[in-house]
């Protein structure tokens, strides 16, 4: 119920700005209190709302992170941040899949894009959704091993970035979520040793599947613009 209300309110805000959820919203962050219990309800409600906005497996979804989050009011079970751009056109947007590494999200019942690349006249922005240690069948890889999961997570992100002609070196900011604070030092050590130039922070926030010990989202920027489009 709360998820539906949040999306309906946001759709109204977009309408007032002459925008739509399908055409202009490029990224969402959904923060779920007690994600292990409440995430399925959020997934169901989002899917229902998306169906009313022509966001389906035949069209497209929105890059997103669904993660543990809390509000000062304990009766608020879900909050959402969003990013939308007015004046953007469909030709500027490309959705990223990396099918050799990951499956399509709707195959296991959720509705978000793995990544979205947006090309402007002078640059390209790449939004990578919350990405974990998953394979092309939608299964958890390296269950119980946070370091191997971190390695596979980075491999998946590299594959998504590659589709947008970007690399890890193009990442401007990244957030790494861990389920257990006991894993902080090991994950930090691994990232610092293997990816010393990565601009990141680590946050304690359980991922939407209990078996995923770590997840990362990021935003990359490259100079690969297209003069057909405005430099918004």
Regions found by a protein language model. Give the residues of each.
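N-terminal presequence-like segments and the immediate start of the first folded domain
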Residues: 1-173, 177-232
């Amino acid at each position: 119920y709360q998820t539906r209300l949040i999306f309906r309110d946001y759709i109204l805000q977009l309408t007032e700005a002459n925008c739509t959820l399908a055409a202009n919203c490029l990224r969402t962050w959904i923060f779920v209190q007690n994600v292990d219990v409440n995430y399925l309800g959020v997934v169901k409600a989002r899917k229902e709302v998306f169906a009313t906005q022509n966001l389906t497996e035949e069209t497209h979804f929105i890059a997103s992170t669904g993660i543990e989050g809390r509000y000062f009011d304990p009766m608020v079970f879900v909050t959402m941040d969003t990013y939308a751009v007015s004046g953007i056109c469909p030709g500027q947007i490309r959705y990223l899949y990396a099918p050799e590494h990951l499956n399509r999200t709707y195959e296991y019942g959720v509705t978000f894009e793995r990544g979205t690349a947006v090309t402007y006249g002078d640059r390209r922005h790449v939004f990578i959704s919350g990405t974990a240690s998953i394979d092309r069948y939608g299964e958890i890889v390296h269950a119980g091993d946070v370091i191997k999961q971190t390695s596979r997570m980075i491999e998946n992100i590299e594959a998504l970035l590659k589709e947008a002609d970007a690399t890890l070196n193009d990442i401007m900011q990244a957030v790494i979520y861990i389920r257990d604070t006991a894993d902080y030092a090991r994950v930090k050590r691994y990232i610092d040793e293997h990816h010393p130039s990565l601009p990141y922070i680590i946050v304690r926030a359980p991922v939407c599947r209990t078996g995923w010990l770590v997840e990362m989202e990021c935003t990359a920027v490259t100079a690969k613009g297209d003069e057909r489009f405005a430099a918004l």
